[in-house]
Each structure stands twice: as structure tokens, then as C-alpha cells.
Amino acid sequence: MKSVDLSKRAKFRVTGKDRVRYLNGQVSNDVRKVSSKETISACVTTAKGKLEGLIWISEDTSSESLLIDADPELRESLMMRLSKYIISDDVEIFDVTEDYQLIHDLGHDDDNLMLSNRFCCNGVDRWIKVGDLIAGSDWMSDKSLEEYRIKQGVPAWGYELNSNTLPQEALLERKSVDFHKGCYVGQEIISR
């Protein structure tokens, strides 16, 4: 089993009793599917349905908050975008990029861990507080990961994805869009 260090990614914690309902109105996938054992991907889009980011959403082990990760270059813009519509909702979004390491174990499918299909195969995400990582992982190099990503057909921000991309153009509707969940920013365009 190879491990991938995704710690450079932007990381956010979403808290408050309205966190699931609020985030569900901001992203293309059904946030109610998220659990401490399952991670989902979702698109953050403009009102015109164009991508503002592809994110991964999981739940912390205490089930008290949602954890989001995204491409590092989207750290500031996504923080602003995801916070933009908080008005009277009991929701707070915190940038925890510097507080956690994010490790993805390829080919791992332990039901007791946070399952994630980031690279089109079974895997597990581990959010680890900085300084708590235990040595011993068999790390995949950045070059090998990029080759693997391309072979698996996984789009990446700055390569196949940008702010002019509609989710369907990158086949993101296959696992990052739920057409039955209800309204979210950009939904009318994406559902056409």
C-alpha cells in the first residue's frame, strides 16, 4: 500500500448546527452522505455553473464538524466563497491548513477508517494533527502520483480544471454532482 502526502492542500473545518444544511446549499454533491467513514467530492461553482473549485468533504471522528480539502492555490478564494453566504446560519468556517497533515493511503479499504475514492480506486484519508504522524509509510513520489493521476483520468486544478470549466466538461458529474439533492449555487445550469 502506497501513501500520498496531501498536506499541501488547503484545509478547512466547518462547525455549527447548520453546517450540513448550509454547505449543501453551496456545493454540487449531497453533503448528507458524508460520515466519519466516507468522504465525498463536490464542486463549488458560480451562479453560471463554472468551477470555483473541486473539494473533498469528510466528517471528523467526533461528528462535530465537517472537514474540507482543496487544491492549495484555492485556499483564499474558497475560504471567501464558502463564507460568502453565511448570514444568520449557525456556521463557522476555519482555515486549518497549518494544523493538519492529510495522508491518503491508496488501495486501502478498512471499514473503520475514512474511505475515499480520490484516485479512482479504494483508499483511505487520514487527517493527522501536525507533529502526530508516525513514520513507516511507503510514500509515493510527486512524479509517480502525477503519472498515476493522469492514468486514472483524475482531473486536477490548473491542468484539466480551471475557472472556465463546467463540471460536465471534466466528467465530474459522475461522482461529484448529485442531481437529486436540491438547490445550490450554479445548480440550474449544471442540471440542464
Which residues fall in each region the model found?
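Basic, glycine/lysine-rich polyanion-binding surfaces/domains
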Residues: M1-R192
